[in-house]
Amino acid sequence: MPSFDIVSEITMHEVRNAVENANRVLSTRYDFRGVEAVIELNEKNESIKLTTESDFQLEQLIEILIGSCVKRGIEHNSLDIPSDAEHHGKLYSKEIKLKQGIETEMAKKITKLIKDSKIKVQTQIQGEQVRVTGKSRDDLQAAIQLVKGAELGQPFQFNNFRD
């Protein structure tokens, strides 16, 4: 029986490239001359830390980072951006978490979405991925289009397609 897996993964190499590109853009921006502004990647915690001198500049840093992430093929909704900034002395900072894997709650939403659509496929939650199995390729492709069309707040990839 044909099957595929729904996963949510980010390539850390691409994230590293996006952060380096954002730092390069930051060094050439006129409005950041003479300002202490840093974009750092922490690969262990899978997070990006933005630090600068004002709240407005912090929002500008986020825009620069999102722009370079999109250029590298990383969807902006795979970044978990907190709404409020931390304030330490004269510096403002935000720690942006990277969304890796599908949490159990999100996997249940995907399973419910597919089952409610009456497509003749079965879903199984397997750790941080959802396996979808069906009798025909057309049913699987319909399930892929359904998940792509749903606004679930996280990007998904479809891999391990077996016939």
Swiss-Prot record:
GO terms for cellular component: cytosol
Disulfide-bonded cysteines: none
GO molecular function, one term: nucleotide binding
NADP is among the record's keywords: no
Domain of life: Bacteria
The entry's keywords: Nucleotide-binding
A Pfam match: DUF520
Similarity field: Belongs to the YajQ family.
HAMAP family per the UniProt record, alphabetical: YajQ
Function in brief: Nucleotide-binding protein.
Annotated NCBIfam families: PRK05412.1
Name of this protein: Nucleotide-binding protein APJL_1242
Species of origin: Actinobacillus pleuropneumoniae serotype 3 (strain JL03)
